[in-house]
Amino acid sequence: MSVFTPVSPAQLTDWLQRYDLGTLVALQGISEGVQNSNFFVDTEDARHVLTLFEKVDSTLLPFYLDLMAHLAGHGIPCPAPRPARDGSLLGTLNGRPAALFSRLSGASVMHPTSAHCAAIGRAMAQLHLAGSTFPAPPHPRGADWIAATAARVMSILSAGDAAMLAAELSCQRDHTATLPGGVIHADLFRDNVLFTDGSTPCIGGLLDF
């Protein structure tokens, strides 16, 4: 169940005043998911998904929302944040950080074929290319963190273990120095990919980065 914080039609109607999306037509909780409260929201103008972020570090949300907007703007079928009238992508609803996204089409495929996997591979390649132009911050567990953590433990290691760790760090630095970098999905599995109906698998949505 992924409605941890309930939202009433009256509360949502008031919150939607910050958007130019018309009158609220329908509100329905979404049962899938384990971290956030999600709702299908229909207004006069379009269909949306409302997310109330329950467990996410709120300082990371601007990066996430800007990334989704960037990828959607480059043709990636991911949830596009709906900007409010003042241009903001993030608000607060019932004490939770909240955002409104485009509603994507399709459904998850529980028994994918090789054709589905090929479509996902193409989508990931497109995502990586689009993400390569997005200014991502340093990874919290990246090279700087690895070097700092290794330095803290070196003094408590035996000479042999310290030498082995130093050799591995050097090997990793040499290996990763020439690799491309950029944003990735990082949580890709069947539930997070939507396929539209058709004789050829076509991805309608990539979810929950």
Protein language model regions, located:
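Conserved NTP-binding catalytic cores of kinases and kinase-like/nucleotidyltransferase enzymes
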Residues: 1-85, 197-202
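Short secondary-structure capping/turn micro-motifs that flank functional sites
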Residues: 32, 87-88, 143-144
